[in-house]
């Protein structure tokens, strides 16, 4: 029975159709937004990478083991994780609880908990197919933004000899360079990175220096207006307060935009309602299937389709080259018809050029 299901899944994957409006995009016209689904597919052995809920639960467990959180607080946060819908608020409160009472976020025990949770990430990469697909898009000019704390993409990219660079919103100069397309292999972590927890913020107030900076906001919002965002492995990104502050609620006329979101279709009614709702934000929702196991293969096939697109510049270069070669061939034939040895003519020309100056 299991083999039959796997065969069915594979056949579904082979027959899957992609939106022409998506696969005909030039890679450099896309901005890839990667969420926890990508990390979960790449390193399934790390529970904290599977979802926001799993990440918070893992941090609470680490805090308990390291004895940096009162047992009463441990119990309270576990209850909140189970009951509260807004996990970002829970995570924010958890960081505050492990930070100085002055409200300053550094130093804090949250950093130690994250280091415990994400220890030796490079050893846990089991299924790199999604990362390889993302890198193939980056090679061709696709920009990448993530809500994840981990740097699995950067680790894998460096293993492939790519000059990967992790960026966060605290560094204005780098953000501007990235947004203007000057850091080809840069990955912007809008929540920060676990290796630098001092730069991690979970609510818009922590980024007031960014959101109140007209220059930074203009270049970021311009990306949302001019690029097609492709959300991959993102379940809660549109509810993310940071993402909302930077893009979703700050860019007008969103229905005129064309973005894409790849999701799991667990329930048909919910999926089609979600699809209709997202069109109001200019986002086309598509499904990779009803099973998470289909996700890596879907991303691989999608990236392959997009990477097949030839850039207009490349086509112009090719046509010019072909025309140039054709002209040279015509000239060569005419010379040969007149009994002139082409190789000698070329050598004579080379000699003249060498001494001409």
Swiss-Prot record:
> Which parts of the chain span the membrane according to its record?
30-46
Q: Which GO terms describe its molecular function?
A: identical protein binding
Q: Which residues carry this modification: N-acetylmethionine?
A: 1
InterPro entries, alphabetized: FAM118
Where is the protein situated, by its record's location annotation?
Membrane
Instruction: Kindly give the membrane topology term recorded for this protein.
Output: Single-pass membrane protein
Question: Which residues are recorded as modified (Phosphoserine)?
Answer: 311
Q: Which family does it belong to?
A: Belongs to the FAM118 family.
Q: What is this protein called?
A: Protein FAM118A
**What is the species of this protein?**
Mus musculus (Mouse)
Task: Report the gene name.
Answer: Fam118a
